[in-house]
């Protein structure tokens, strides 16, 4: 017997044996031999099945659509035909359909274009009104006063940040003319002033006075000056964003700033320069250092004595935010605990837009597909509202303000030029203006329904799900493609 066992079988014997099953070619179902046959077909009602792709155009101002479809709509909520056939009227196109092969899951790359003409002060964006609490009446004999809340409304328009502050102060003055003046309230008791200065520059801690005798007339940040009993309510407005003040916890309800909130923000009185510059009397010692009590027209600064020294009857939000620890020796300002100073935003804090294509896109599982109004349409994409705040540097704001006052007769903004607190605030050297920016956005792939109507509804809503009347151009393109097979579960 051989040491290595039997010899291997001959070649002819091996090849004559049937091939084992584990080395045979696998069996392939018929549909895999033609993987694209009919699975990417797009069917128009008037054409036979075609295998090429198509583009869908959503345009807000097709002339053929306006009369039949959009007489009661606008550029942010409209209907448009997507069957590209000029022989069809919009009514006929509404009976047509585009059928995407239902054996596949379809998606489309969504690209949009939006143009807006949104002004900075408008009722739509809640940037034209706020509530203020002012002195309603004053009894000189008893010294008692009553305070009431009033709504002030600015005229709508596209204004810069400095003009908005001027309009706010003018609205406060008009309220005084309507109510307070008729009931014994003096001009120095108006109680609310919007300003832009830092009233603490030049402060002497020894005398508690502004020793230069004048408040520095330079722009720092929008400020709110209040007297006792007065308040400003920003609960239903975005003007606080325009002024650069926000709540530290913005989702909490209510936003009221009162005089009592501005602890440590007392505006220091001015040095009485007229008394200081007088020659000292014989044996009187040095110059007279005392607080200025009233302006040249007799309007009082309401100077009063406190534990911290002499202060005026006015409190500044800007001072309370920045200088409370210096004045009251507190570790942290009470205003800082719930307020935050921000860069002014002339847009009022413009938010986002939502896209809805209720007749085309598959609704997300969290939305009910039964919505019949723009406020209830399923949201398929979002983008920022196309408006931005642009900053323009003005190296000579004071010169520009003087020229403007003398050429444009803007004395109405400076009704009390003799009063150091009530005078017109300085204009900013960094002027903000709103700019509507055309945006082209790629939203990625959007899942599509398999049957598309020849007329499609398009809705672009704001953060409150309202249609936006300031959208004046809205267009979109969709390029359908297959995402996957519907048989793959």
From Swiss-Prot:
- Indicate the secretion signal residues: none
Q: Where in the cell is it found?
A: Virion; Host nucleus
One Pfam family here: Adeno_Penton_B
A GO biological process of this protein is:
endocytosis involved in viral entry into host cell
What the entry lists under InterPro entries is as follows: Adeno_Penton_B
- GO molecular function of the protein, one example? structural molecule activity
Give the CC-aspect GO terms.
host cell nucleus; T=25 icosahedral viral capsid
Q: What induces it?
A: Expressed in the late phase of the viral replicative cycle.
Q: Which UniProt keywords apply?
A: Capsid protein, Host nucleus, Host-virus interaction, Late protein, T=25 icosahedral capsid protein, Viral attachment to host cell, Viral penetration into host cytoplasm, Virion, Virus endocytosis by host, Virus entry into host cell
Its primary localisation, in coarse terms, equals: virion
Annotated function: Major capsid protein that self-associates to form penton base pentamers, each in the shape of a pentagon, situated at the 12 vertices of the pseudo T=25 capsid. Involved in virus secondary attachment to host cell after initial attachment by the fiber protein, and in endocytosis of virions. As the virus enters the host cell, penton proteins are shed concomitant with virion acidification in the endosome.
Q: Give additional notes from the record.
A: All late proteins expressed from the major late promoter are produced by alternative splicing and alternative polyadenylation of the same gene giving rise to non-overlapping ORFs. A leader sequence is present in the N-terminus of all these mRNAs and is recognized by the viral shutoff protein to provide expression although conventional translation via ribosome scanning from the cap has been shut off in the host cell.
Subunit comment for this entry?
Interacts with the fiber protein (via N-terminal tail region). Interacts with the capsid vertex protein; this interaction binds the penton base to neighboring peripentonal hexons.
What protein family does this chain belong to?
Belongs to the adenoviridae penton family.
This chain's protein is named: Penton protein
Q: Which gene encodes it?
A: L2
């Amino acid at each position: 017997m051989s040491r290595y066992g039997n010899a291997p079988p001959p070649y002819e014997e091996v090849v004559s044996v049937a091939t084992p099953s584990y080395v045979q070619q696998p069996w392939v179902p018929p549909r895999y031999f033609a993987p694209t046959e009919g699975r990417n077909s797009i069917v128009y009602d008037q054409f036979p099945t075609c295998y090429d792709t198509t583009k869908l155009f959503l345009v807000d101002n097709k002339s053929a659509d306006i009369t039949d479809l959009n007489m009661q709509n606008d550029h942010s909520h409209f209907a448009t035909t997507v069957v590209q056939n000029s022989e069809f009227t919009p009514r006929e196109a509404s009976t047509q359909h585009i059928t995407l092969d239902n054996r596949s899951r379809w998606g489309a790359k969504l690209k949009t274009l939006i143009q807006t003409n949104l002004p900075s002060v408008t009722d739509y964006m809640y940037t034209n009104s706020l509530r203020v609490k002012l002195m309603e009446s004053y009894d000189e004999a008893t010294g008692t006063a009553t305070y009431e809340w009033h709504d002030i409304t600015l005229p709508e328009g596209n204004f810069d940040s400095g003009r908005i502050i001027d309009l706010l102060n003018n609205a406060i003055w008009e309220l005084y003319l309507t109510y307070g003046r008729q009931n014994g309230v003096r001009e120095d008791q108006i109680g609310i002033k919007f300003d832009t200065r830092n009233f603490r520059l030049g402060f002497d801690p020894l005398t508690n006075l502004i020793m230069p005798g004048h408040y520095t007339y330079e722009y720092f940040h929008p400020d709110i000056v209040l007297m006792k009993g007065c308040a400003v309510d920003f609960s239903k407005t975005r003007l606080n964003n325009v002024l650069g003040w926000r709540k530290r916890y913005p989702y909490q309800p209510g936003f009221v700033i009162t005089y009592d909130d501005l602890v440590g923000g007392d505006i220091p009185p001015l040095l009485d320069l007229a008394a200081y510059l007088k020659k000292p009397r014989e044996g009187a010692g040095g110059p007279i250092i005392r607080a200025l009590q009233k302006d040249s027209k007799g309007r009082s600064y309401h100077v009063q004595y406190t534990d911290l020294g002499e202060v005026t009857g006015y409190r500044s939000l800007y001072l309370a935010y920045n200088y409370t620890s210096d004045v009251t020796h507190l570790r942290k300002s009470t205003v800082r605990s719930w307020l935050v100073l921000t860069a002014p935003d002339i847009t009022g804090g413009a938010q986002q837009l939502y896209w809805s294509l209720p007749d085309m896109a598959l609704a997300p599982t969290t939305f009910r597909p039964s919505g019949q109004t723009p406020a209830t349409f399923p949201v398929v994409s979002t983008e920022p509202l196309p408006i931005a705040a642009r900053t323009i540097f003005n190296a000579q704001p004071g010169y520009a303000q003087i020229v403007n006052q003398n050429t444009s007769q803007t004395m109405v903004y400076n009704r009390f030029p003799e009063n150091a607190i009530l005078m017109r605030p300085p204009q900013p050297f960094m002027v903000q203006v709103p700019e509507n920016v055309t945006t082209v956005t790629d939203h990625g792939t959007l899942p599509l329904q398999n049957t598309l109507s020849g007329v499609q509804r398009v809705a672009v809503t704001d953060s409150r799900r309202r249609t936006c009347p300031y959208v004046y151009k809205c267009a979109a393109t969709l390029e359908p493609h297959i995402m996957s097979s519907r048989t793959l579960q």
